[in-house]
Design a protein with these regions (language model features):
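A conserved helix-loop-beta module that forms one wall/lid of the active-site cleft
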Residues: 1-28
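Conserved protein-kinase catalytic-loop segment immediately C-terminal to the catalytic Asp
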Residues: 17, 122-123
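Residue-level signal for tight coil/turn positions that link beta-strands
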Residues: 13, 69-70, 125
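C-terminal active-site "lid" helix and adjoining low-complexity regulatory extension at the edge
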Residues: 96, 110, 123-164
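Protein kinase-like catalytic core scaffold
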Residues: 16, 51, 73-74, 117, ...
Length: 164
């Protein structure tokens, strides 16, 4: 049985993050502190499918992890919640990542049977929190991703999973 929108909204605990269901590199992300702010934002996003998430205070950085056939690429990006935050990525080497971040990232791929995906996490006072798993993330500007994508396509062709 489906809950009515008002029933769902009445269960919200603020603050929450509201964001587009579709990736826009943080263009459509807002922190909402109360029901009045949510009601005020609704007309602006009327045609946009949205996701509401519990707000997790963080250190101000999003950790972006991209995986192509078990190869991890990583970067830090300023959270889109900070006014005027640059949208550029600051690349990280996998050596800079804690081992548990790498292992959980690869485990996510196994769990969802993904060979190409992205994981976004935040560093909070209580530790890292995964906030997104993207089954088809953008790789623009990710150093080395183009070569890894070519290798994946070649491997899928060899496995007979794609044909010309």
């Amino acid at each position: 049985h489906l809950l009515k929108q008002q029933d769902v909204l009445s269960t919200l605990s603020f603050p929450v993050i509201i964001k587009s269901r579709y990736s826009h590199r943080g263009d459509l992300v807002s922190k909402i502190d109360n029901r009045e702010e949510l009601d005020a934002l609704a007309p602006q996003w009327r045609q946009e499918p949205v996701i509401l998430q519990e707000f997790s205070p963080s250190d101000g950085w999003d950790i972006k992890l991209w995986v192509i056939d078990q190869q991890i690429f990583a970067a830090r990006r300023r959270t889109p919640l900070e006014p005027g935050a640059p949208k550029e990525d600051f690349p990280l080497t996998t050596d800079e990542l804690p081992e548990d971040w790498k292992s959980i990232t690869l485990e996510i791929g196994k769990t969802f049977n993904l060979r190409l995906y992205g994981v976004d996490l935040l560093m909070t006072d209580s530790g890292p929190v995964i906030v997104d798993v993207n089954s088809f993330p953008g790789f623009r500007g990710v150093q080395g991703a183009d070569d890894a994508l070519v290798r994946l396509v070649e491997r899928l062709g060899e496995e007979g999973k794609i044909t010309a």
